[in-house]
């Protein structure tokens, strides 16, 4: 999975999500809850717009015309023992402060979308987020 994700640009993510959302509509779904954890560039560096990838998911949902609950995933560690993220996980990782900024920026983007768009929080797991991060 990590090798595939290392190939994806924001344009790729938007194109893939647009296709998936269109196919969901054709299958009868009216909305999607997008468990979204790809936040940073291939090197794990944040984009200038922290919510770049979230904005691409929002754009894809808007193009397709599907309802959206955006669930940015908070991913902090590689294991329960607080191991640092491995190279393939760097695109997911945030510290608490940066994740809150990312979520705030994504919330502003969601607010400009259709009225049925909403945003939540998605801590990845007990392995990837410690109690202080919650």
Say what each PLM segment does:
Residues 1-45, 51-52:
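Metal-associated gating/positioning segment near the N- to mid-region
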Residues 40-134:
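Metal-coordinating catalytic core of metallo-dependent amide/deamination hydrolases
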């Amino acid at each position: 999975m990590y090798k595939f994700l290392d190939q994806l640009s924001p344009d790729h993510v938007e194109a893939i999500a647009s296709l998936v959302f269109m196919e969901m509509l054709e299958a009868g779904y009216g909305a999607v809850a997008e468990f979204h954890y790809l936040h940073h560039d291939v090197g794990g560096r944040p984009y200038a717009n922290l919510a770049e990838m979230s904005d691409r998911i929002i754009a894809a949902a808007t193009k397709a015309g599907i309802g959206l609950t955006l669930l940015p995933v908070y991913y902090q560690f590689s294991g329960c023992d607080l191991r640092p993220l491995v190279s393939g996980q760097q695109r997911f990782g945030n510290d608490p402060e940066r994740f809150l900024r990312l979520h705030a920026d994504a919330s502003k983007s969601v607010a400009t979308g259709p009225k049925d768009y909403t945003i939540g929080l998605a801590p990845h797991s007990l392995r990837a987020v410690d109690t202080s991060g919650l």
